[in-house]
Amino acid sequence: VGCEEDPMHCKGKQAKPTCCNGVCNCNV
């Protein structure tokens, strides 16, 4: 599928959540 940024994953944080195959990681 690949990876894409999901800005709605982390609220109230200046982060770029990267979602890969349903797994999201918040990069603060």
Swiss-Prot record:
Q: Which GO terms describe its molecular function?
A: ion channel inhibitor activity; potassium channel regulator activity; toxin activity
Give GO cellular component annotations, separated by semicolons: extracellular region
Q: Has keyword Chloroplast? A: no
Q: Which UniProt keywords apply?
A: Ion channel impairing toxin, Neurotoxin, Potassium channel impairing toxin, Secreted, Toxin
Expression sites (tissue/organ): Expressed by the venom gland.
- State the superkingdom: Eukaryota
Keyword Secreted listed: yes
Enumerate the InterPro entries for this protein.
Scorpion_toxin-like_sf, Toxin_alpha-KTx_8/9
One Pfam match: Toxin_6
Could you tell me where this protein is found in the cell? Secreted
Which family is it part of? Belongs to the short scorpion toxin superfamily. Potassium channel inhibitor family. Alpha-KTx 09 subfamily.
State the function annotated in the UniProt record.
Blocks potassium channels.
Domain comment text?
Has the structural arrangement of an alpha-helix connected to antiparallel beta-sheets by disulfide bonds (CS-alpha/beta).
- Designated name of the protein: Peptide 2
